Amino acid sequence: KDKENVKTLDDVDLTVNTGEILGIAGISGSGQKELLEAIAGLQNVESGSIRLLDDNGGEMELSGMDSISINEAGISLAFVPEDRIGMGLVGDMDMTDNMMIRSYRNGKGPFLDRKGPRALAEKIKDQLEVMTPSISAPVRQMSGGNVQKVLVGREIAQNPKVLLVAFPTRGVDINTSHVIYQLLNEQKKKGVAVVCVIEDLDVVLELCDRIAVLCGGKISGVVDGRTA
């Protein structure tokens, strides 16, 4: 259910495999974003279960766990939200501080060395060609595309086993879109289970191994992508 206690998802049964990109498609308001937020522990799940297989083949139950509890349990899950400034990055902070915020969420703190986060900020800036005069500038001063590069780069740097991505290319230029698609493909090749919501159907078909179609909060079907 959402914050207003309205049921947004109903009887959703999905599996995402390691080394796979699962796309979530549907018209606006079908529950795509809410599905990712539920997996990430940001939406209340009234019934059912969300399970993650560990390295030994055992199951870890995520249902009922919020995002903080998921991190504290050492569950390797990263989430790139639709809201880049706010839920994603803190607009008034620079890149280094935003890297540190992620470390706090991982339980590393309160006395955190800035050298590691600063090095990560420099690495993301160079590798993803983030256009900013300095990593010390507030991220709010960056363009939407550059903010998205920083956010995606930060989450991928956590080396997650599961990567959830909501509308990663909304409102960004074509070059940034290609960079992000390449990053998602690289994660797939590393064996990460990627779940993403992308609005462009042609991109979904090309990028994703399988696509789950949501309609009214329910799965109406799962189809193979062109890359499958």
Can you describe what each PLM-predicted range is?
Residues K1-A228:
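Glycine-rich phosphate-binding loops of nucleotide-dependent enzymes
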